[in-house]
Structure formats: structure tokens, C-alpha cells
Amino acid sequence: RVLHNRGEVSQKSRKKIEKILTELNYQPNIYATALASKKKYTFITLLPETNKGEYWYDIKKGVDDAAKELLDLNINVQQIFFDQYDETSFTQSINTILTQSPDGVLLAPVFKKQTTALTKELKIKNIPFVFIDSDISELNALSYFGMHSFKSGYLAAKLLLKDEKNNSDIAIFQAYHT
């Protein structure tokens, strides 16, 4: 009764129980709460299409594994994929998300202009969003999962140059899809 403010409890008993809860550093079990509430949650992931062995494959597999674990907690994860080299594909995926009004969105912000438009709509609808792999800090995502690009580049260069002889040539290759 004290935990959930249900029913009458004397002030003396309430204070005694609250003191014990504080001493024990009591935290409610979010899984039990989710199961008891019977509310269903839907989260959407927006990731690039991928095949085994490609960069995004392990991320997709992680989402698949998490979705299986969360299913018993009334949490449904819907995955939407787009062609990472095609802005139209990304825009179509955004439109799909906006028609569904999920409880949250995890997305790879590959195209900045379209991502900005999506996050603006999500904010209007009070739908939280999280970025993965790339961060667009001015869009104020709830969270970001990925590397710190500057620090990663700095470390890579430092390791590359660690045993570098003064006469060595270094080549850097970067692929672009056309």
C-alpha cells in the first residue's frame, strides 16, 4: 500500500516503511512493473540494409537479440531498413515511422537534412529518439551509441605513427559510393 499509494495506511506505519525503504535503497523492479502494467510498447529501429559480414550486420543482430529478450516484457521492436546510399529510401522509411507513432526510435542518422526533419516531428509528438553510429549533437537525441570520431581518429593516427620511420609514406583510402 505504501509503495503504490493504495489504500489507507497510518502515518506512523507509512514513515516506518519509508525509512526502511530508504535504508535498503529500495528501487522498484522495472521488469515486474512492465509485466504488471500490461501496457505494450513499440520501438522502431531505422538502420541501413545489411548483409552478413558488413558493418551494420552486427548492429542488426544485436537489435534482433534484444528484441527477443524484450518480447516477454510487452516490448515490440520493429525494424525498418533503408538503402544507405539513397536519400529517397531514407525519406520513405521516415514516412513509415511517422505514420506509426512508436514509443521510441533508434536510428542511424545517415542523411542529416532528412534526420533533422524526422527529429523535429518526433519532438512535436513527444517521441524520444536515440542515435547510433553517428551523432548530430544539435538535434539533442536522448542518447547516442557510437565512437567519438575525433578521439578515434586521433588514436588511429597515433598508433599508425608510433613506429613510423621518418622516410615512410602513408596512404589513406576512403571509399565513396557513386
PLM region descriptions:
Residues 98-109, 128-132, 169-174:
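Periplasmic-binding protein-like
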Residues 87-103:
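Short, well-structured alpha-helical segments in soluble
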Residues 144-171:
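Hydrophobic alpha-helical segments within soluble ligand-binding/sensing domains
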